[in-house]
Amino acid sequence: MEGGSITPGEDKPEIQSPIPPNQIFILSGQSNMAGRGGVFKDHHNNRWVWDKILPPECAPNSSILRLSADLRWEEAHEPLHVDIDTGKVCGVGPGMAFANAVKNRLETDSAVIGLVPCASGGTAIKEWERGSHLYERMVKRTEESRKCGGEIKAVLWYQGESDVLDIHDAESYGNNMDRLIKNLRHDLNLPSLPIIQVAIASGGGYIDKVREAQLGLKLSNVVCVDAKGLPLKSDNLHLTTEAQVQLGLSLAQAYLSNFC
């Protein structure tokens, strides 16, 4: 019989559910949030692969969990977006470095951090409008994440590279981001939800207009971390593993300095 069988009376292995998180962070945006650190083209086999090199800042921790695609809490490990940003090869992103840095700075040992990956590579901000698949999935996953009593502490948002090629998209970015934040806060009933967005480091065309909108957004409880100058891979678009670690630490510092 395929798949084997369980003898009558034989105990099924017990699955230990982790203690649910009490501090929850949403990770959203496009590919640099999903993580492409360490992803390279294997020309021999003509496919993209992750090198599986894991910096110590990104090491797993039993007190850092992630919400899987099927809405279960499990111990977090890279790639955080493996079952979320599907159809692509994910590698190291900023999430684990961020979570470890925050965990190390918190004064209580009882803190359990929950990461909710929602990013999707190659997406423009108009694809995150209320009613879209990506927006509604993010809201659903966020709502699910707090059913066990955890508190949504912040949204980390890294997106914009797909909005630099068209002048209209670039000039509309600020208004679109403003609307996204207001919609998300309203739909989650969290009017003061902290948002930490990343000013993009790469992309051609009208990148300066998108960055200007990101750095100049004037909303309460919104801060911006600038990724400009962080090391890029040979594609001049995605952050290296080292850069993702640096970004994660910068995001943690922004959170701890502004919202703790």
Curated annotation (Swiss-Prot):
Pfam families: SASA. InterPro entries: Carb_Esterase_6, SASA, SGNH_hydro_sf. One of its GO terms (cellular component) is cytosol. GO terms for molecular function: hydrolase activity. The active site is at residues 31, 235, 238. Residues 1-22 are annotated as: Disordered. Keywords: Hydrolase. Gene3D superfamilies: SGNH hydrolase. Its EC number is 3.1.-.-. Belongs to the carbohydrate esterase 6 family. PANTHER family: 9-O-ACETYL-N-ACETYLNEURAMINIC ACID DEACETYLASE-RELATED, ESTERASE, PUTATIVE (DUF303)-RELATED. This is Probable carbohydrate esterase At4g34215. The lineage of its organism: Eukaryota, Viridiplantae, Streptophyta, Embryophyta, Tracheophyta.
